[in-house]
């Protein structure tokens, strides 16, 4: 343990040291949290409803009626009436004049009398003068939004009184467009008398503004900060019916302030579909009952409404009649909608005969709008309509989809007229209720359904629930017709059900969505506890939801665990993090991302990602169920192999910003967006939000640190740090990529694909051996054209006696069209991902083959292969294995030279034994008579041709890979030097055609080199990303290669690639790279370990074999190493292929699943959102047996609660123990649990902690548990405590102060320390340990003897210090047992019989066969465990 770590707590900083406090063990309210439960199950906490509301509301009513004005506030933390400024409500308010202002601007008092609201003008003004609150109910189009504020302003102008009106709108675009419309109508210059404010976008000065249109959130934040309404004379709350959380909380604030210090401000509530009685009761006092003024909007055209029971001509399913309680659309519902369209068409054909309007004109203005709840239902309806077209060719329809994730180009199709003779049918979600108006719609088919987002506050899981739409929604939908002519609405429910059963209004957001932002607003408002404030809502939430929200806010660091030092389950003091979160228009976890981004000096990246996560529809959806289009793969392109949807958002935005800043015109931007399948509209919204967040962060003091250029993070470090802050921001949305819990998982993978490389191979099934598959390889390759994989980039092979077809993709960067177009993380090639996606979209694919009975005559007539004893033998190329340059099975060490280095994972070695052969060939090739065949015409060079090409100063054998794709200069070709391994680009002048005699002599001679890779190591995710070897590691290998003759130790040979250890003077380069942290130790693949074991046993027996025996064994060995050949034969003509075989696949043995590590998600199935870059989840590092961590931005839950869907996912770096380290780093508190002997840590339990008296968790649902598979030591915990301390110190503020205590210079120093500590934590080489389930549970433990950690910030710590249980020394007797067990295993290693079942006690692994035992002894886990007990095999 180094001195720097031990000196951590001596960190000198002028901060107040507070006495240490117990963390996670503070008394709780037993009524809410004390329940008995099993460790693996989530406790069922009692649901506490709204009984708490009545007492609080009664007290508030007294306040509204003026009977509590003299009461003192309870407790210093609750601000109430006497803390607020007053407008002297007991005295007559002096009338403020504004004559000079009215002289500055022109006031035209002529209003539009054609609007229906005008008839109520005098009544509205009289009501406003007489009452503090007025409710106006007017249908859309009556003019209330633009006219009522003008009526008020005109009256003020007439009397010369001061007037300042604010009007809220739920959406930004509405506030801007309405303000501009009023300015245009009144001929006012914009941003003078009338203006707008959305977010932080506002005029430089509002001094001349008397009519302000703003979003609901803008007014709410102003009122919370000012705690008075008196800045305005009139507050108009428009679209009150929408009932989002901002509106409901605004009503709370307005009502409270109206009753206390702002009694002379007038409140006007307006909506089209308002529950007037509910609002009137909410604002009623003993002195005033708000009047309700209703105005009706007359339509020019009539609308007829029909219900299901009125559609007698449609045959409904008898079982459905009268049973509509379950909201759903079954197959009969879809068919009924199709029948209605047929009826509409027949009706218009008859009408055309009887009237002047032609049928074509009826089609043009007779569009049908079908309201469906989601994209799945849209696709299903489209399929039913397509079937209708096939059955009735007389009806021609143009199907148009409309939903929020579509591209703007596709959405424009909604407004375009259909082709002549076609009827437009628009399949839409509720987006067309109000956001989109299509004039030519004459018919609406409404299934009266909606998908509503609901969040479980205990689990934080959201779900889209299919529910009956409210009548208000249905009325909005009906209003889409009757614009140009009379219309019809078909509601697919019975009239009685519609009138009696369907809800009048939708569920308010406060009852179905997270309450974090509302609770934070209540804390900032500081007029009572969150419970006391939210109880006053129009629709108060359940007390359990408030309690869960408090716990969530404590989890994200927005609230301290305590209030004035005392634990309160329903409250907590506001942290500075919470203050920041309350001022950002984001979800709390997105705000946490920005906070951590600032701390780690990645603020800009965090802002962009947070803005992108807040804006839906960035990646355009093409519609339909197929994902094979380029739009899906754009996620991979922009994620750049990071495995992160969030990184993809960041890179898309940077690309867009580059287009904007470089001055490209709009058309260029549109072309770019269309090419890469991103939504330009969403990008513009993200851009606006990014700008707003930057301004807000600046106001909060969140400004990027001034860092010296030499201290800037490079791309590699930035990628790691970005993933660390993503893990911190979205804790505990953690998942692990799980593998089969089977000791023979590796063997099963290779057995499934017959020994092929799983990282490059997929397979089909259902192709019988009798089909003679070798003749159809080209036809099978053609299947991959749909994902644009060229045929030359794959080999198709078969296994004798099997129904499988194996497709192996070539691993060559020089092949045109190779996998680099779509970057992916890990070792798996992108072609494998594309192939698996093919199967996910369509399981079966047809292949046309000949009838087996006619096959033999076909191949015999054409001389294709041989037919021996009725069996067809495909033509094969003879292979002389004795000529191969591959290492012999008896060769352990080989001397030679490295001829070419691509990277540490691919280089070529030339044995010294070939030195004379190479020299002789070089002399022959470079003889003048052999170099006369100059290449004068590029057409003479063909792909795959063997030529003589110049390497350094001499010509050598080379194979042409392909021509360069450059037409503007002399022809050049990519060639590979056969006997050296390197590839290069050469002009024709440096190439010679090989004479025939040389081709005959050397054409079939295998390369005099073999490919190698470093054994038992892999690239470090911390040092280099995307499974790439770092430059430093490659440079070290090049330095060794330049030394000349070197010795390599062959570990294994698989797929003709040797895994080797390279010996140097001072050790082995493999170990040196690990020591220098340029790579990390890694297990070898199953096939590699199997080959290594085989080689070891053959080498041990070599002394007993003769030379001839050795040669025979080696030839058999090398022959067994060769995989089946791709015959690439031309298939029979299609006219001869009458039989269709349905291939099933492609499949990959690397497909895996995810599991949640939170307690609430442990038993649920987990999917990844189908649009995510991780939607195709493959085991990208199959040799690595660690569980890889995946972090989700959001988690959705299925309707039945059994399946979770992770959205916005990020695959974390493949670092040993990364998941456990992130839990220890970012959980509010954690416990390291020991094995039953107390000698090692075996699991990490993280969460909010527990009640010290009962050990019951505060927030059981969000407790996380990770079983350790690497060694976590005391040094690691001290490092993590350092990091937590530095994170806390950035925003630490004393209780009496509002701003953080540290200066900018101190923040730079903290950032520098954090970088260093994070790198040390992640780069550490940790030893593997066995998985131990003896103490892997969710039970919190208290240990009175455990010393409390030194707590620098006391109870004001967001990340308190972790305490640590001291480990015990391993018992001597136990060590002896483990060593004896190891010795026994090694003795059984060479046994040739049947192994009795035994267990490796070191690794807790059951061993059932000798081969399994041998391979287990070669794993890193076992070798590390042997070192830990000091075992040495003699």
Curated annotation (Swiss-Prot):
| Enzyme class label | hydrolase
Q: Which family does it belong to?
A: Belongs to the DEAD box helicase family. DEAH subfamily.
Query: What is the purpose of this protein?
Result: Probable ATP-binding RNA helicase which plays a central role during spermatogenesis and oogenesis by repressing transposable elements and preventing their mobilization, which is essential for the germline integrity. Acts via the piRNA metabolic process, which mediates the repression of transposable elements during meiosis by forming complexes composed of piRNAs and Piwi and govern the methylation and subsequent repression of transposons. Involved in the repression of LTR retrotransposon copia.
**Keyword ATP-binding appears in the UniProt entry:** yes
Q: Where is the Helicase C-terminal domain?
A: 354-526
Q: Which SUPFAM superfamilies match?
A: P-loop containing nucleoside triphosphate hydrolases, Tudor/PWWP/MBT
Q: What is its EC number?
A: 3.6.4.13
The alphabetical list of record keywords is: ATP-binding, Cytoplasm, Developmental protein, Differentiation, Helicase, Hydrolase, Meiosis, Nucleotide-binding, Oogenesis, RNA-mediated gene silencing, Spermatogenesis
Which species does this protein come from?
Drosophila melanogaster (Fruit fly)
> Where is the short sequence motif DEAH box located?
238-241
Q: Which GO molecular function terms does the record list?
A: ATP binding; ATP hydrolysis activity; ATP-dependent activity, acting on RNA; helicase activity; RNA binding; RNA helicase activity
**Which protein, by its recorded name, is this?**
Probable ATP-dependent RNA helicase spindle-E
**Knocked-out gene: effects:** Egg chambers for females lacking spn-E display startmispositioned oocytes. At a low frequency, females generate early egg chambers in which the oocyte is positioned incorrectly within the cyst. At a high frequency, late-stage egg chambers exhibit a ventralized chorion. Flies show transposable elements derepression, an aberrant piRNA profile and a reduction of H3 'Lys-9' methylation and delocalization of HP1 and HP2.
* Origin organism lineage: Eukaryota, Metazoa, Ecdysozoa, Arthropoda, Hexapoda
């Amino acid at each position: 343990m180094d001195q720097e770590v031990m000196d951590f707590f001596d960190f000198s900083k002028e901060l107040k040291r507070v006495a240490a406090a117990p963390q996670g063990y503070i008394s709780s309210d037993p009524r809410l949290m004390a329940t008995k439960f099993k460790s693996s199950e989530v406790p069922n906490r009692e649901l506490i409803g709204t009984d708490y509301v009545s007492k609080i509301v009664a007290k508030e009513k007294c306040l509204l009626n003026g009977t509590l004005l003299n009461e003192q506030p309870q407790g210093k933390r609750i601000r109430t009436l006497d803390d607020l400024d007053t407008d002297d409500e007991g005295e007559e308010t002096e009338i403020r004049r504004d004559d000079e202002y009215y002289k500055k601007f022109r006031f035209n008092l002529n209003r539009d009398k054609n609007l229906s609201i005008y008839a109520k003008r005098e009544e509205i003004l009289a009501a406003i003068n007489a009452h503090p609150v007025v409710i106006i109910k007017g249908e859309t189009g009556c003019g209330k939004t633009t006219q009522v504020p003008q009526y008020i302003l005109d009256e003020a102008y007439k009397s010369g009184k001061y007037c300042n009106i604010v009007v809220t709108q739920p959406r930004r675009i509405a506030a801007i467009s309405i303000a501009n419309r009023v300015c245009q109508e009144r001929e006012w210059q914009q941003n003078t008398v009338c203006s707008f404010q959305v977010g932080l976008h506002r005029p430089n000065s509002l001094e001349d503004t008397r009519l302000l249109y703003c979003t609901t959130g803008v007014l709410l934040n102003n009122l919370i900060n000012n705690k008075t309404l008196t800045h305005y004379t009139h507050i108009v709350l428009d679209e009150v019916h929408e009932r989002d959380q901002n509106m409901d909380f605004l009503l709370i604030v307005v009502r409270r302030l109206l009753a206390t210090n702002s009694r002379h401000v007038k409140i006007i509530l307006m909506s089209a579909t308002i529950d007037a009685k509910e609002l009137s009761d909410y604002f009623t006092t003993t002195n005033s009952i708000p009047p309700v003024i209703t105005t009706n909007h007359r339509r020019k055209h009539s609308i007829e409404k029909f219900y299901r029971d009125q559609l007698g001509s449609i045959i409904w399913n008898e079982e459905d009649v009268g049973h509509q309680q379950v909201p759903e659309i079954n197959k009969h519902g879809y068919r009924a909608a199709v029948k209605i369209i047929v009826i509409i068409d027949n009706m218009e054909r008859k009408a055309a005969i009887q009237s002047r309007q032609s049928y074509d004109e009826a089609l043009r203005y007779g569009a049908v709008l079908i309201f469906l709840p989601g994209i799945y239902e849209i696709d299903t309806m489209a399929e039913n309509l397509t079937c209708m077209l096939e059955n009735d060719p007389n009806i021609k329809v143009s199907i148009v989809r409309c939903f929020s994730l579509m591209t703007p180009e596709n959405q424009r199709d909604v407004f375009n007229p259909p082709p002549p003779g076609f009827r437009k049918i628009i399949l839409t979600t509720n987006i067309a209720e109000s956001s989109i108006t299509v004039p030519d719609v004459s018919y609406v088919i409404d299934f009266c359904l909606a998908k509503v987002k609901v969040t479980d506050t205990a689990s934080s899981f959201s779900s889209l629930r299919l529910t009956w739409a409210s009548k208000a929604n249905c009325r909005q939908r009906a209003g889409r017709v009757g614009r140009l002519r009379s219309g019809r609405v078909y509601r697919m429910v019975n009239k009685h059900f519609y009138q009696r059963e369907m809800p009048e209004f939708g569920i308010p957001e406060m009852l179905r969505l997270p309450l974090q932002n509302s609770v934070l607003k209540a804390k900032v408002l500081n007029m009572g506890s969150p419970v006391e404030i939210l109880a006053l809502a129009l629709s108060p939430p359940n007390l359990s939801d408030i309690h869960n929200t408090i716990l969530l806010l404590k989890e994200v660091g927005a609230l301290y665990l305590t209030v004035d030092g005392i634990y309160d389950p329903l409250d907590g003091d506001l942290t500075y993090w919470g203050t920041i979160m309350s001022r950002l228009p984001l979800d709390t976890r997105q705000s946490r991302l920005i906070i951590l981004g600032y701390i780690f000096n990645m603020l800009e990246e965090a802002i962009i990602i947070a803005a992108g996560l807040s804006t839906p529809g960035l990646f355009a959806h093409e519609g339909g169920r197929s994902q094979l289009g380029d739009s899906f793969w754009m996620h991979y392109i922009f994620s750049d192999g990071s495995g992160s949807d969030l990184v993809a958002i960041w890179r898309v935005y940077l690309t867009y910003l580059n287009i904007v800043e470089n001055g490209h015109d709009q058309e260029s931007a549109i072309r770019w967006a269309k090419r890469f399948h991103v939504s330009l509209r969403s990008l513009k919204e993200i851009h606006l939000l990014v700008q707003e967040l930057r301004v807000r962060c600046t106001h909060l003091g969140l400004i990027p640190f001034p860092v010296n250029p030499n201290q800037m993070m490079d791309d590699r470090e930035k990628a790691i740090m970005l993933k660390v802050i993503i893990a911190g921001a979205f804790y505990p949305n953690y998942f692990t990529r799980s593998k089969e819990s089977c000791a023979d998982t590796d063997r099963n993978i290779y057995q499934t694909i017959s020994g092929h490389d799983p990282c490059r191979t997929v397979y089909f099934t259902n192709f019988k051996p009798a089909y003679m598959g070798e003749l159809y390889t080209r036809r099978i390759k053609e299947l991959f054209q749909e994902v644009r994989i060229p045929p030359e980039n794959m080999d198709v092979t078969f296994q004798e006696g099997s129904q499988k077809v194996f497709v192996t993709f070539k691993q060559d960067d020089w092949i045109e069209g190779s996998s680099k177009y779509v970057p992916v993380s890990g070792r798996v090639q992108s072609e494998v991902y594309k192939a698996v996606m093919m199967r996910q979209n369509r399981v079966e694919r047809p292949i046309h083959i000949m009838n087996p009975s006619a096959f033999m005559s076909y191949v015999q007539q054409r001389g294709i292969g041989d037919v021996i004893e009725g069996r067809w033998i495909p033509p094969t190329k003879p292979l002389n294995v004795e000529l191969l340059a591959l290492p012999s099975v008896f060769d352990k060490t080989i001397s030679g030279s490295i001829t070419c280095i691509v990277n540490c994972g691919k280089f070529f070695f030339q044995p010294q034994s070939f030195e004379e052969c190479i020299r002789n060939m070089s002399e022959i090739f470079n003889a003048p008579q052999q170099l006369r065949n100059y290449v004068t015409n590029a057409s003479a060079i063909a792909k795959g041709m063997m030529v003589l090409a110049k390497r350094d100063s001499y010509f050598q054998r080379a194979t042409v890979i392909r021509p360069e794709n450059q037409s503007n200069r002399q022809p050049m070709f990519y060639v590979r030097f056969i006997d050296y391994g390197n590839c290069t680009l050469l002009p024709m002048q440096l190439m010679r055609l090989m004479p025939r005699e040389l081709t005959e002599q050397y054409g079939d001679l295998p390369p005099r080199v073999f490919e190698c890779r470093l054994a038992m190591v892999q690239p470090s995710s911390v040092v280099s990303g995307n499974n790439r070897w770092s430059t430093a590691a490659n440079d070290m290998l090049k330095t060794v290669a330049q030394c000349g003759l070197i010795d390599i130790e062959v570990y294994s040979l698989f797929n003709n690639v040797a895994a080797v250890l390279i010996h140097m003077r001072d050790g082995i380069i493999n170990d040196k790279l690990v020591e220098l942290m340029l790579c990390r130790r890694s297990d070898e693949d199953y096939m590699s370990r199997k080959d290594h074991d085989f080689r070891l046993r053959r080498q041990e027996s070599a002394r007993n074999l003769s030379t001839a025996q050795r040669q025979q064994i080696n030839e058999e060995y090398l022959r067994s190493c060769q995989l089946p050949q791709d015959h690439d034969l031309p298939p029979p003509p299609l006219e001869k292929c009458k039989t269709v075989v349905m291939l099933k696949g492609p499949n990959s043995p690397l497909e895996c699943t995810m599991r949640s590590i939170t307690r609430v998600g442990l038993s649920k199935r987990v999917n990844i959102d189908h649009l995510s870059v991780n939607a195709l989840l493959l085991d990208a590092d199959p040799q690595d047996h660690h569980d890889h961590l995946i972090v989700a931005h959001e988690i959705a839950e299925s309707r039945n609660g059994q399946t979770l869907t992770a959205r916005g996912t990020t695959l974390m770096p493949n670092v040993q123990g990364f998941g456990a380290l992130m839990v220890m780093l970012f959980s509010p508190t954690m416990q390291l649990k020991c094995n039953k002997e107390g000698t090692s840590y075996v699991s990490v339990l993280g969460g909010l902690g527990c009640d010290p008296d009962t050990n019951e968790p505060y927030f059981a649902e969000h407790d996380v548990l990770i079983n350790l598979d690497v060694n976590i030591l005391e040094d690691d915990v001290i490092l993590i405590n350092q990091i937590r301390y530095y994170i806390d110190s950035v925003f630490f503020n004393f209780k009496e102060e509002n701003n953080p205590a540290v200066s900018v210079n101190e923040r730079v120093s903290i950032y520098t320390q954090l970088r260093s500590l994070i790198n040390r934590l992640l780069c550490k080489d940790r030893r593997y340990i066995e998985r131990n389930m003896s103490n892997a549970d969710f039970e919190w433990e208290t240990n009175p003897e455990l010393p409390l950690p030194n707590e620098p910030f006391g109870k004001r710590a967001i990340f308190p210090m972790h305490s640590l249980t001291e480990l015990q020394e391993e018992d001597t007797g136990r060590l002896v047992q483990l060593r004896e067990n190891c010795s026994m295993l090694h003795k059984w290693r060479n046994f040739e019989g049947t192994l009795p079942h035994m267990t490796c006690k070191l690794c807790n692994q059951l061993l059932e066969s000798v081969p399994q035992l041998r391979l287990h002894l070669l794993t890193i886990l076992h070798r590390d465990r042997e070192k830990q007990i000091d075992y040495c095999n003699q």
